[in-house]
């Protein structure tokens, strides 16, 4: 695991999956005073290292999910074994996290280990923080991104796969509607963050050509 500070209040954990290529998996910590908010948990075997890293920064306060796929939620049950903290995702994601229905692009329901524990995100969930969530459907129906308003840092989950200079869509077969996902990417032109951070890829600085080039290259 590699822990890096991306901005004053945002830290990034990087792990690697071998499936069979090496794929980086990023999760994040948002520091607020002595408290730490965890954005995504990675898979279960990442949890112990992630917990140690979080405790070095502050006191775990809550888990915020971008969506319910296993490489984002798989470690959540381990966190809840250690800490009595709430876990949140968008309302539209809960029936998949709870195993009530499979994702529209899958045949089997998810086994998240936190069924009927995850609470719906509301405006009040983050009202005390300089953090805002935005619904960005396509990769999954209830996918969200999180924007730290002070640090101007956008945590995009699987909305994009990023390289140093370009945006790319998530893997099509793991996405419900790739064109809807690409349309959701317009959020970056609405927010205009300084830094864009994805779950799988490199940090990239925002510029006004990024999304235009992305649409031209990938939108059907």
UniProtKB/Swiss-Prot annotation:
The keyword Cell division does not apply. InterPro entries: Metallo-B-lactamas, NDM-1-like, RibonucZ/Hydroxyglut_hydro. Its EC number is 3.-.-.-. It is an enzyme of class 3 (hydrolase). Zn(2+) 2 binds at residues 71-72, 158, 200. It comes from the Bacteria. Its cofactor is Zn(2+). Zn(2+) 1 binds at residues 67, 69, 139, 158. Keywords: Hydrolase, Metal-binding, Zinc. Pfam families: Lactamase_B. Coiled coil: none annotated. The keyword Zinc applies. One of its GO terms (molecular function) is metal ion binding. Binds 2 Zn(2+) ions per subunit. Belongs to the metallo-beta-lactamase superfamily. This is Probable metallo-hydrolase YybB. The gene is yybB.
């Amino acid at each position: 695991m590699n822990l890096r500070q991306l901005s004053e209040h945002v830290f990034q954990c990087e792990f690697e999956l071998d499936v069979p290529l090496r794929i980086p998996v990023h999760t994040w910590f948002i520091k607020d005073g002595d408290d730490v908010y965890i954005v995504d948990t990675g898979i279960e075997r990442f949890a112990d290292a992630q917990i140690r890293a979080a405790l070095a920064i502050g006191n775990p306060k809550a888990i915020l999910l971008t969506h319910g796929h296993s490489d984002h939620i798989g470690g959540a049950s381990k966190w809840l074994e250690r800490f009595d903290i709430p876990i949140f995702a968008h309302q539209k994601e809960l029936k998949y996290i709870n195993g009530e229905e499979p994702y529209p692009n899958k045949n089997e329901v998810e086994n998240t280990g936190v069924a009927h524990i995850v609470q719906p995100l509301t405006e009040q969930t983050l009202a005390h923080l300089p953090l805002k969530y935005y619904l960005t459907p396509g990769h999954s129906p209830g996918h969200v991104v999180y924007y730290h308003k002070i640090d101007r840092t956008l945590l995009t989950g699987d909305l994009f796969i990023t390289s140093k200079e370009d945006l790319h869509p998530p893997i099509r077969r793991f996405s419900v509607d790739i064109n809807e996902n690409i349309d959701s990417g317009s959020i970056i032109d609405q927010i205009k963050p300084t830094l864009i951070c994805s779950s799988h890829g490199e940090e990239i600085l925002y510029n006004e050509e990024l999304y235009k080039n992305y649409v031209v290259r990938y939108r059907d």
